[in-house]
Amino acid sequence: MTMTDPIADMLSRVRNASNAFHDSVTMPSSKLKAHIAEILKQEGYIEDFAVNDRKDGKAGKELEITLKYGPTRERALAGVRRVSKPGLRVYTKSTNLPKVLGGLGVAIISTSHGLLTDREASNKGVGGEVLAYVW
């Protein structure tokens, strides 16, 4: 069966694994998912990620994300929300970039310069499609 929104699936898997206090989560990989994982790592929401060959021997790659927790096992990733969906795309101008929790969270934006956080997009003066909010 074809997946209609692979980004929402990725974010749901990460959120569910974090809520269940799993050490890592595995999912089918793509370039876009790897870029999102890179942003999550840069912003300190996940420990690490790796793109590996599938363990079952089938064609394709899988993305393994190692989740991050504090010293007393508190979650680094408090919440995540998919904004732009296949049925309703959400775009923003560079002058209207969203702030997540007053700047405490991060908006992931797909721009002509690649995937950027809201702060990076503001510095470069570009807008784009708002993919997700992470806090």
From Swiss-Prot:
The keyword DNA-binding does not apply. One of its GO terms (molecular function) is rRNA binding. SUPFAM superfamilies: Ribosomal protein S8. One of its GO terms (cellular component) is ribonucleoprotein complex. HAMAP family: Ribosomal_uS8_B (MF_01302_B). Belongs to the universal ribosomal protein uS8 family. This is Small ribosomal subunit protein uS8. It comes from Corynebacterium urealyticum (strain ATCC 43042 / DSM 7109). The gene is rpsH.
